[in-house]
Amino acid sequence: MKCVDDQSKPEDFRRPGHVFPLISRKGGVLVRNGHTEATTDLMRLAGLKECGVCCEVMKEDGTMMRTSQLWEMAKEHNLTFITIRDLQDYIRIHEKHVKEEAVANLPTQYGDFKMYGYINDITGEHHLAL
């Protein structure tokens, strides 16, 4: 499948087409509540290449199904159903994105402390703790 082939090039795909290539944001659903990010996060969590195909499910009248309608369809067809929020919660519980970067002694007139430096590997934010 060309969409997961590391050697694929833009000219390998017919354009315009019915499957539009999308690029997910680094950090996945923790930085953007998008279907693209959910798709690549699910593939990553499954231990697969972070590439997939996502679609919106349409009703008979051509409009997009909403969450309540999708829940009903999932029940009717015995399908597993999760939301982006469920995926975000799972990732926050099971993955660590704040890493210890440095430790330093901090002697003060009030006593000796240790200072710990951390970095969030998704946002790049730095944090200090005493």
Name every feature range the model reports, one short phrase each.
Residues 1-130:
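Catalytic domains of riboflavin
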